[in-house]
Design a protein with these regions (language model features):
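N-terminal beta1-alpha1-beta2 submodule of the flavodoxin-like/Rossmannoid cofactor-binding fold
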Residues: 1-88, 93-100, 170-173, 181, ...
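A short small-residue
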Residues: 3-8, 115, 152-160
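Short, histidine-centered active-site or binding-site loop motifs used for metal coordination
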Residues: 10-12, 120-122, 155
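Residues on a specific face of well-ordered alpha-helices
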Residues: 24, 28, 97, 133-137, ...
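A general structural signal for alpha-helical elements within enzymatic catalytic domains
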Residues: 28-31, 107, 140, 184
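Mobile beta-alpha loop/short-helix "lid" or hinge segments that flank ligand
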Residues: 41-53, 141-159
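Helix-loop-strand module that forms the ligand-binding subsite of alpha/beta enzymes
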Residues: 66-142
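Glycine-rich phosphate/pyrophosphate-binding loop and the adjoining helix
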Residues: 146-199
Length: 199
């Protein structure tokens, strides 16, 4: 059976990025625990492909068909992934505008039932509910399955843009284990013997 794919999506628009480090750590642990492949998409890399002022055809990139191939490939990777880890830095009390634009280009039916793990980074604990009040409703629109456990991290939880506190590392480990267990159950349902059991 083909291994499941985990795609990490980080809404950072600068590098180095604590958000990217967090998303990457979660996705890597999930992949290791579940035997999945994983890929990291950072907005700092694909943003120029999602926001070209004018593309080769002279059309603004408000529709995916007008995007360069690299931009379309990022969206298709999200749509075809078996599971997604989504993280954002907090800007003005919400997720980054670049992250919202990316998901505005995702097909409304592409994430139905897809497992999604949410995380965010911020400079103050006052934004601690951003995963619940901002990110979860966004993926509720897509009818995705968002993991009950989310991760919120502060700048002080990192050292040199890498996870620096044991408490955050423990939360990442717990969330990754829960997500991997969910993926393993999904993989089991896709095995031929599972299908025969319900025939």
């Amino acid at each position: 059976m083909t291994s499941l794919s985990v795609v990490g999506v980080s809404g950072n628009i600068a590098r180095p990025s604590r958000t990217a480090a967090l998303v990457s750590a979660i996705a890597a642990q999930v992949a290791a625990l579940s035997g999945s492949s994983n890929r990291l998409i950072e907005l700092v890399d694909v943003g120029s492909r999602l926001f070209p002022s004018v593309n080769a055809d002279g059309l603004k990139a408000f529709a995916r068909d007008n995007l360069p191939q690299e931009g379309r490939s990022a969206i298709e990777a999200i749509e075809t992934a078996d599971a997604i880890v989504v993280g954002t830095p907090v800007y003005k009390g919400s997720y980054s505008g670049a992250l919202k634009h990316l998901f505005d280009l995702v097909r409304p039916d592409a994430l139905i039932g897809k497992p999604v793990l949410l995380c965010a980074t911020a400079g103050t604990p006052l934004h601690g509910l951003v995963t619940e009040h901002q990110l979860r409703p966004l993926f509720g629109f897509f009818n995705a399955f968002t993991l009950p456990t989310t991760i919120f991290a502060l700048e002080s939880d990192f050292q040199n843009y890498q996870i620096g506190k044991a408490e955050l590392a423990a939360r990442v480990k717990r969330a990754a284990a829960e997500f991997a267990e969910l993926l393993e159950a999904k993989a089991a349902r896709q095995r031929p013997e599972a299908a025969l059991a319900f025939a």
